[in-house]
């Protein structure tokens, strides 16, 4: 089989599992899909309710190093609260492939024509094409997921905190060492006003 598209694999690893959990937690499907801005190069992966969620993923069993792609990504001056959602995946034979996860989401939103259309549009924007579904063979299971609220003590660089003259930054943080209130997705969605 051909190597899986890194863009589509990235969508799976970073965002689709969270999207499914949002809908399972009571966020209306269309609202959850409309908030999913990752495929559209949004500053955060989800802008929902009054705030946002940035999804980070690791396959590592130890530690949780997350790559932050800009000074804007963890800036909560525009949207509050802001959560970093850490998702730990494991590649296992009993896991779910990307096409299986997509099929499950399509089934979940099947009764809403607008939601089906929006899901298809976002998947294409993310680089997932159903015609290539046979190429996505890796199976993953979510072993842990947590939402960490970004507050004053959270380690981050923003335009407001970076030294004068710094206009761009890409950096790593260890989510296991980052201070902040840790909750599950449903609690975070409540705090965001999404459910």
Role assignments for model-derived ranges:
Residues 3-8, 12:
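Single conserved hydrophobic/aromatic residue that forms the stacking wall/gate
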Residues 13-16, 26-39:
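Phosphate-interacting basic helix/loop segments used at nucleotide- and nucleic-acid interfaces
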Residues 22, 46-59:
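Conserved catalytic cores of phosphodiester-cleaving nucleases, focusing on short active-site segments
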Residues 32-52:
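Beta-rich nucleic-acid/ligand-interaction surfaces
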Residues 57-120:
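Catalytic cores of nucleic-acid endonucleases
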Residues 117-177:
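C-terminal structured domain segments
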Residues 168-195:
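Charge-rich, low-complexity intrinsically disordered segments
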